[in-house]
Amino acid sequence: MSQDGGQGRYAGRALAGGRYQLRDLLGEGGMASVHLAYDSVLDRQVAIKTLHTELGREQAFRERFRREAQAVAKLTHTNIVSVFDTGEDDLDGMTTPYIVMEYVEGRPLGSVLDEDVRQQGAMPADKALKITADVLAALEISHEMGLVHRDIKPGNVMMTKRGVVKVMDFGIARAMQSGVTSMTQTGMVVGTPQYLSPEQALGRGVDARSDLYSVGIMLFQLVTGRLPFDADSPLAIAYAHVQEQPVAPSAVNRALPPAVDALVARALKKNPNERFPSAEAMRDECLRVAASFQAAPPSIVPGAQTSSGAGVGSAVFPPVGQGTPAPTGPVQTPYQPTPSPGPNPYGTPAPAAHSPAYGYPQQAGYQTPAPAPYAQQQAAATPPPYNLTPSAQGSGSGSPGGKSNKPVIIGSIVVAVVAVGGLIGALLMNGGGDEDPEAGGGGSSTASVSASPSKAAGYRGPDKEKTIEKDKCTEPQESYNDPDKIQVPDFTFKYIGSVKECFNAAGWQMKVVEVDENTYGEGSVRDQFPTAGTDVDPENMPEIQLKVSTGNPPSE
């Protein structure tokens, strides 16, 4: 969102029967404008975001926007811009939704980065890691409440005059993707191209790990002064997110230690399961890495480029459901978390094990290698390759001096790539991600997968505080696209005992698959299918499959 500071089109107007008096325009973007305002009831300054009039024409969208604002208002954290109120009012004869927010005296992170780039070429790594850790602290809170941001970028992060990080615009991207406005058609996604995760670019369902990818993009930008993927068109940028590998940040900024390269590389994995399992885990790693090296001024490599999208001309991007089937086989080099003793600190990829996968396979424990010497980590089971073709159920501030990266609506990018010389065909292979898992006998059946009945060395006990309310099952969220359907709740990271109580209250059926994993402890739900947010018919509720941790470390 650009910063203005002048008089906006609504300056001098009032909202909510005169309670909120709009003053200076603070910023304006593709979806909304933000004004400084005075709350005459509580005698304080606030910031008011008014959605552009074309977005408020349909009642269904306004209702979705209101519900999202209510959800965001429940988020309370030092690093989150508070939401005080929401409503709609007539401005220039048009119904205009608005949100009343905490007024942050400061400037966007993009402006802070611009200054660092002018002075040093990039932001110092220790400063960037601390800011990133604070952003992740905010996301940790929102993810625990089931709210995915969907549009993390420097323009949505504020820095106060005292250096406090504030993340804003939670829920705005989700409200935009309601599928009910004239601007948003089926198979379309909303976001900022430079920060989209591969699954967002593909129009697939997203979860907390999509935000972590966007945080990885932002961290790359902070420590290098440029974006890992940038091109002349949103389509080319989205193609790069799905198909291209980013350069190591140290190839741009020679002052960066290998641990920063490894941290960013993990955050930017195409397969969500190969990223950090949670905002908390990524935050801990940022702080660990920040404490592991001596801070040094950035040393930018002259002429280093990160241009992308060269292969987009040979790719076809039809709407979801209209793509040609991709050939079978692995999509990308399988994940191997064990570092090798050789010059490559990230290890030599090992063949992927063949196993059924439904959506996202189990995330194995992994820690970014230490800067020197590289710590030998315990190898985790290699997850199946991530299927980059659309699933059958298909859920629905740029670099300094760079191109505009305002939020735009992009066609869902199905990577049904035209085979050119056999090369593209080798890139896109179906890793079995759309195969159905073996059917279980009953709703409470449990299939044990490499689970050990005893507590192995490294065992982590259960965290029974991670609970889910029963009403998440008995009164689930109604689908935004079909009033006759509901959305599957988010059970990930919750304790299985609490989840079972939720299921029993609603009369739902589950299938539990035990997996060896000691990141969150015994009984923690690590994955689910259908994924959270999937639209289902409550009259024909499918069996929900849950991957649950045994608390034991992954077998070597």
From Swiss-Prot:
The active site is at D151 (proton acceptor). Residues 336-348 have a biased composition (Pro residues). The keyword Kinase applies. Residues 482-550 form the PASTA domain. Its EC number is 2.7.11.1. InterPro entries: Kinase-like_dom_sf (IPR011009), PASTA_dom (IPR005543), Prot_kinase_dom (IPR000719), Protein_kinase_ATP_BS (IPR017441), Ser/Thr_kinase_AS (IPR008271). Residues 461-475 have a biased composition (Basic and acidic residues). Residues 360-381, 445-458 have a biased composition (Low complexity). One of its GO terms (molecular function) is protein serine kinase activity. Gene3D superfamilies: 3.30.10.20, Phosphorylase Kinase, domain 1, Transferase(Phosphotransferase) domain 1. SUPFAM superfamilies: Protein kinase-like (PK-like) (SSF56112). It comes from the Bacteria. Residues 300-403, 435-485 are annotated as: Disordered. Residues 20-287 form the Protein kinase domain. The keyword ATP-binding applies. Pfam families: PASTA (PF03793), Pkinase (PF00069). ATP binds at L26, G27, E28, G29, G30, M31, A32, S33, V34, K49. It catalyses: L-seryl-[protein] + ATP = O-phospho-L-seryl-[protein] + ADP + H(+); L-threonyl-[protein] + ATP = O-phospho-L-threonyl-[protein] + ADP + H(+). It is an enzyme of class 2 (transferase). SMART domains: PASTA, S_TKc. Keywords: ATP-binding, Kinase, Nucleotide-binding, Serine/threonine-protein kinase, Transferase. Belongs to the protein kinase superfamily. Ser/Thr protein kinase family. This is Serine/threonine-protein kinase PksC. It comes from Streptomyces coelicolor (strain ATCC BAA-471 / A3(2) / M145).
